[in-house]
Design a protein with these regions (language model features):
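Catalytic cores of the polymerase beta-like nucleotidyltransferase superfamily
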Residues: 1-402
């Protein structure tokens, strides 16, 4: 039924010639049924870790003991890796996330019924075909996300499943079943028990989904609980390109909310600078105004802010892009490094080191307003007319005579 790669076929052959069972399980089976090539493969078996390890080593697979306590090993061959986990039952949960106790089982159904959604609770082997006790294939065909068994219990066991339901809805375009949706809202307060890093990871995947707008609109209350701020602008998601930084810029209002969700410092700084720059675009109507803005912001936050601004004000953004093209085509200066005059030249003329930055900044302001002034001789004369050289204590700009 499924087209399996060579190493995967070999794995199944090993187990079929042994007393043990082996099945593909979870997301890879779901992807196969949807016509999607899986990115990775999870397998499950009634063999204990020690038994699987012995089988695999005999057939020249490398074995990594990646999760012995959880009954998991990784089989490697020809740069391919496969996680194999013993059938298991989870008993009790710590802080609505991790099971208190794992009990290994001899029955596949025990392993499938502990899973989150019916679409992820399907197993497959080449000899036995699909094993689907919770009608997962039907939910895939109906494009529905439905919990295995009682939804509130599934969310109580692992509160991250609440966000996973929303994320799958956004990425796959599936609707959340009525009973599962009711449990999402009923159990939303359990999300406070989860680590910020887990919340951030699921939120990122959700925001990058093709149905992010529809899901965010329907479950805005849940997402506001996650990000701890009021969401004021969802409409941008309808047409926003699949760029995470841009979507974060539109989705969040305050940098502090990103920091609270443990986003990297680089992301938070980029967000802050882009927010500032975005506000300034409303007042940009000339090349000179635009160059002064380019002077203050690196190109990464500038371009990010402009891409977002284009979603809200496409006509004005197009005008700004036209001005930007003129600036770059003409090589007009807007940074200190673009100046014909360098700090070393100022030092050789007797200007003190601590004043050089201020002088170059004044020069830059002049050439931004008139690019023709960006000539070494002109700038030297301009500086001499405005600043005193040598080691004088008072190096304030010279006052111009009326």
């Amino acid at each position: 039924m499924f087209e399996l790669e060579k190493e995967l076929k070999e794995l199944f052959d090993i187990y079929e010639k042994s007393p043990y069972e082996l099945y593909l399980v979870g997301g890879c089976v779901r992807d196969y049924l949807m016509g999607i090539t899986p990115k990775d493969y999870d397998l499950t078996s009634n063999a204990l870790v020690s038994e699987s390890k012995e089988l695999l080593l005999k057939r020249h697979f490398r074995v990594l003991e990646t999760g012995i306590k959880h009954g998991t090993i990784t089989a490697l061959k020809n740069h391919q890796s496969y996680e194999i986990t013993t059938f298991r039952i989870e008993k009790g949960h710590i802080k609505h996330r991790k099971p208190k106790e794992l009990v290994f089982s001899a029955h596949l159904t025990d392993d499938l019924k502990r899973r989150d959604f019916s679409m992820n609770a399907i197993a497959y082997s080449p000899t036995k075909g699909l094993i689907d006790p919770f009608k997962g294939r039907s939910t895939i065909e109906n494009q529905t996300i439905e919990c295995v068994g009682e939804a509130r219990l599934r969310f109580f066991e692992d509160a991250l499943r609440i966000l996973r339901a929303l994320r799958f809805s956004a990425t796959l375009g599936f609707k959340i079943a009525a009973s599962t949706k009711e449990a999402v809202f009923a159990c939303k307060d359990l999300l406070k028990h989860l680590s910020k890093e887990r919340l951030q990871s699921e939120l990122n995947k959700l925001l990058m989904g093709k149905n992010a707008y529809e899901v965010a609109k329907e479950y805005q209350e849940i997402l506001e609980l996650v990000i701890q701020e009021k969401i004021e602008n969802l409409g941008f998601l309808k047409n926003a390109p699949l760029n995470l930084e841009l979507r974060l810029l539109g989705f969040f209002k305050h940098q502090k909310s990103l920091e609270n969700l443990r986003y990297p410092k680089k992301t938070c700084v980029l967000f802050s600078k882009a927010k500032e720059c975005h506000k300034a675009f409303l007042n940009i109507h000339s090349k000179t105004e635009l160059k002064f803005l380019l002077k203050d912001y690196d190109l990464e936050p500038f371009n990010l802010a402009l891409d977002f601004y284009a979603l809200e004000n496409p006509k004005h953004a197009l005008k700004i892009k036209g001005l930007l093209k003129e600036i770059f085509d003409s090589n007009e200066p807007f940074r200190k490094e673009h100046l014909a005059l360098k700090g070393g030249t100022l030092q050789s003329l007797g200007y003190q080191h601590q004043k050089i930055g201020e002088i170059l900044n004044a020069c830059l302001n002049s050439v931004i307003e008139n690019p023709k002034n960006n000539a070494l001789e002109w700038l030297i004369e301009w500086v001499k007319g405005h600043y005193l050289p040598n080691d004088a204590i008072n190096l304030s700009p010279i006052r111009q005579k009326n």
